[in-house]
């Protein structure tokens, strides 16, 4: 049974969860509203995406750029959670934690779902090689391995955060999947194979000991918080038109970005969501490849870009 901090175990009316999401192609300013709402929450959950999404939060006049960490990490009274729907690149996450702690932010409250999947070196290499192979038909990915990581999750061959806690299981899974990845690298892209020992050395010896204190039952924490009447903010990355199913496919991200993804990515039921807040901005922008029907060019377009 998860024990809650005293401030969560209060006898008040139950406060269901709130979802904050973008309604366009991203960069709508979700971080600003998240910052305002977070102050009335006890838990803030990032429920999908990876380090391909960034957002900026301003707290007490200080600006913080975040990639994987939810904005709740900036508040000492909030438990920040990385949900099972996120794909985690350990080095990026640890570097982000280190940068924040160097600025006086305490990240010890962070909880990472053991069911979240890991972004592996072969994901990043295959992402870049596939884009190059597609040439003029490329999708414009960030080449950070997000798509291949989600593909392995769907194929049921992905490694998860909790695998870092058991070296034997991690190595067994790694050797199985790496055999296939190396065959693709060699026979399709004429690349040298990756070393299982080298990958395991980084992930088990370098990353696992530092991430272990954060790994826990994220779903249990969220449910216990809601049951105790605590507020939970579900923080989405990217936006609606980049959703894998409902966006401008194939020029989309590799996860579901709409409100429904908060249920699967954080482990809550739809009836536990009280509010879904969609953020839009006055004029739409889009980064990367893909259709943009309302694009403004010329002098006005240049002026909007500069602003």
Model regions and ranges:
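Non-transmembrane, aqueous-exposed alpha-helical and coiled segments at domain scale
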Residues: 2-307
């Amino acid at each position: 049974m998860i024990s809650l901090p005293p401030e969560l175990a209060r006898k008040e009316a139950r406060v269901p969860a709130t979802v904050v999401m973008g309604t366009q192609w991203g960069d709508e300013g979700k971080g600003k509203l998240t910052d305002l709402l977070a102050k009335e929450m006890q838990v803030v959950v990032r429920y999908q995406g990876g380090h391909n999404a960034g957002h900026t939060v301003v707290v007490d006049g200080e600006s913080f750029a975040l990639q994987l960490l939810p904005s709740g990490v900036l508040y000492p009274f909030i438990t920040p959670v990385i949900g099972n729907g996120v794909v985690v690149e350990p080095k990026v996450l640890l570097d982000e934690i280190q940068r924040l702690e160097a600025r006086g932010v305490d990240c010890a409250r962070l909880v990472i779902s053991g069911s979240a999947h890991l972004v592996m070196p072969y994901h990043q290499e295959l992402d870049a090689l596939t884009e190059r192979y597609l040439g003029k038909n490329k999708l414009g990915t960030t080449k950070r391995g997000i798509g291949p990581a989600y593909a392995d999750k769907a194929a049921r061959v992905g490694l998860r955060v909790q695998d870092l806690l058991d070296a034997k299981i991690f190595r067994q899974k790694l050797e199985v999947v790496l055999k296939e990845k190396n065959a693709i690298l060699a026979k399709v892209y004429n690349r040298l194979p990756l070393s299982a020992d080298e990958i395991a050395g980084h992930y088990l010896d370098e990353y696992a000991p530092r991430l272990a204190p954060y790994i826990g039952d994220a779903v249990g924490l969220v449910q216990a918080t809601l049951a105790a009447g605590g507020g939970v903010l579900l923080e989405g990355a990217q936006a609606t038109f980049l959703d894998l199913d409902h966006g401008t496919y194939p020029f989309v991200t590799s996860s579901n970005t709409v409100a429904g993804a908060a249920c699967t990515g954080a482990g809550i039921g739809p009836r536990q969501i009280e509010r879904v807040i969609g953020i839009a901005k006055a004029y739409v922008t889009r980064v990367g490849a893909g259709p943009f029907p309302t694009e403004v060019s010329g002098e006005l377009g240049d002026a909007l870009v500069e602003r």
